[in-house]
């Protein structure tokens, strides 16, 4: 199993309007979010290094997210 707990993932899906959420759906969304998170984080690391920093800032994450779209 991945890094993200599936209970909050189920709440995210329910907040989107679902009445019921299967465990398979929770696990599938968690996997997608982890993959997206890793790609965004990787790009944020590149941005910070390019700026001469070792510390990843929120602005790096936001810019990487915009680039990911």
UniProtKB/Swiss-Prot annotation:
GO cellular component: chromosome; cytoplasm
UniProt-listed GO biological process terms: DNA topological change
Record GO terms (molecular function): double-stranded DNA binding; protein heterodimerization activity; protein homodimerization activity
Subcellular location: Cytoplasm; Chromosome
UniProt entry tagged with the keyword Disulfide bond: no
Induction: Expressed at constant, high levels during exponential growth and during stationary phase.
Pfam family, one: CBFD_NFYB_HMF
Domain of life: Archaea
Gene3D superfamilies tied to this protein: Histone, subunit A (1.10.20.10)
Residues the UniProt record annotates as site (Interaction with DNA): 14
Region described as Interaction with DNA: 20-22, 54-57
Region forming the signal peptide: none
Main localization category: cytoplasm
Family to which this protein belongs: Belongs to the archaeal histone HMF family.
Assembly information from the UniProt record: Homodimer and heterodimer of HmfA and HmfB. Forms primarily homodimers during exponential phase, and heterodimers appear when cells enter stationary phase. Dimers then assemble into higher oligomers, with the DNA wrapped around the protein core.
Name this protein carries in UniProt: DNA-binding protein HMf-1
Annotated source species: Methanothermus fervidus
Gene that specifies this protein: hmfA
